[in-house]
């Protein structure tokens, strides 16, 4: 089903299911030297999407496609490590606020060794925030930083909601928009970065990833992956979840607002 302007979801439906997919890929990572996320698999099981539960429980064998979930997990492990290092490098440099936009099943507030006094803000849909908070509490997990949740749709006035949770606009912050941008319409994407710029004190940092051309989700190789996941019982079509069409180039958008940008890598 195609997106609508005011659509909503939980972690088992629509865009929310992509957060569960990402958590499953983190759980599949076998290299403990790269990432360590002990909460990924329990969170996936708690959501209960059958195909991802079977994946993390080892009931689905690796395939040969480049989009096979097991192969994609290797890329997700690298992405996760990049953002882990981004936040910890910022924190060690004295940046005491971290803001995780569209936090999903991200457990960095619980699993990273944050310096004392660090405040981690998680911004996501109310149902997503509530589910993760309650599930991690049931697991006995304790945050390793001061965790503050902002339960709001990123298409709404999340900046005001963030300030209400005592975000300090006079202190630098580290921001992440991980795996997020393709799920926002053009206006919301531009507003997202304008808000980040307006809220950021000197010394703030921002990390994000983006897909230059969403036509990749209609590529025959990706469609083969979709068909394979459908065979396994997962019916969400990612081509229906992303916003297609022209939008501002993020690098140009931020450069025009005085940001210093460092491209780290490009895939494809």
Curated annotation (Swiss-Prot):
Molecular function as annotated in GO: methyltransferase activity
Function: Exhibits S-adenosyl-L-methionine-dependent methyltransferase activity.
Family note: Belongs to the UPF0677 family.
NCBIfam families named among the record's database cross-references: mthyl_TIGR00027
A Pfam family: LCM
Residues reported in the UniProt entry to bind S-adenosyl-L-methionine: 124, 153-154
InterPro entries: Ppm1/Ppm2/Tcmp, SAM-dependent_MTases_sf, SAM_mthyl_Trfase_ML2640-like
Gene Ontology process terms (BP): methylation
Parts of the chain that traverse the membrane: none
Keywords, comma-separated and alphabetical: Methyltransferase, S-adenosyl-L-methionine, Transferase
Protein name according to UniProt: Putative S-adenosyl-L-methionine-dependent methyltransferase MAP_0663
E.C. numbers: 2.1.1.-
